[in-house]
Amino acid sequence: MSLSTEAKAKILAEFGRGENDTGSTEVQVALLTAQINHLQDHFKTHIHDHHSRRGLLRMVSSRRKLLSYLQRTENERYNALIQKLGLRR
């Protein structure tokens, strides 16, 4: 249920600050958002998959913490990221 290498490369190119940037907050949030969206589609067909649902909740919590950090430290980058990803906060 992880993302393909091509999907990750596309996200890195779009949200990365440099060509080898894999750890910036924006990239981490974008990757988590893509995985969360993928899992949401999975749960539409596999309603009783509770083990994966726990993983989804961990990802959502991790993304929330990263977004809180970004909002606290660099509000302009936070607002741009929220708008680009279409998240509501």
Curated annotation (Swiss-Prot):
SMART domains: Ribosomal_S15 (SM01387)
Cellular component, GO, one term: cytosolic small ribosomal subunit
GO biological process: translation
Alphabetized PROSITE patterns for the sequence: RIBOSOMAL_S15
InterPro entries per the UniProt record, alphabetical: Ribosomal_uS15 (IPR000589), Ribosomal_uS15_bac-type (IPR005290), uS15_NS1_RNA-bd_sf (IPR009068)
Similarity comment: family membership: Belongs to the universal ribosomal protein uS15 family.
Main function: One of the primary rRNA binding proteins, it binds directly to 16S rRNA where it helps nucleate assembly of the platform of the 30S subunit by binding and bridging several RNA helices of the 16S rRNA. Forms an intersubunit bridge (bridge B4) with the 23S rRNA of the 50S subunit in the ribosome.
Subunit annotation: Part of the 30S ribosomal subunit. Forms a bridge to the 50S subunit in the 70S ribosome, contacting the 23S rRNA.
Protein name from the UniProt record: Small ribosomal subunit protein uS15
